């Protein structure tokens, strides 16, 4: 079982540790205060990544490139991706077409950092599950090998990886 939790402005998660301890996968994402100053946003993200319950950093920029759009949050990607590497947190490759998150330049940087990835459709309705193929195409174009994509692994290996960070 898994959950997507909100990263609060102070870097805490919006769910209690006793709940998170019962889950196999925890995706941490920012859903509010997306316009924080760069240094504060970087600190917020790193604090969340240091939480041993966090397995995946979701839609890291929060941007939307279609419709009314939304600019990406500003953060120091080198510092955030270094934290992902240090704490073995995968980076979500969000397949929602209006997100395209992370953008290509951050995806390239994450590959350079040797990060693991989780491809996620971000589906909110059954017909949106087909977006997964878009994420797979982006991963292939970015040169991400299947072994760096955590959700291509057998379930037992995925759960073992997610449980490898001591709480």
Placement of each model-derived feature along the sequence:
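Phosphate-binding active sites in nucleotide-utilizing proteins
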Residues: 1-2
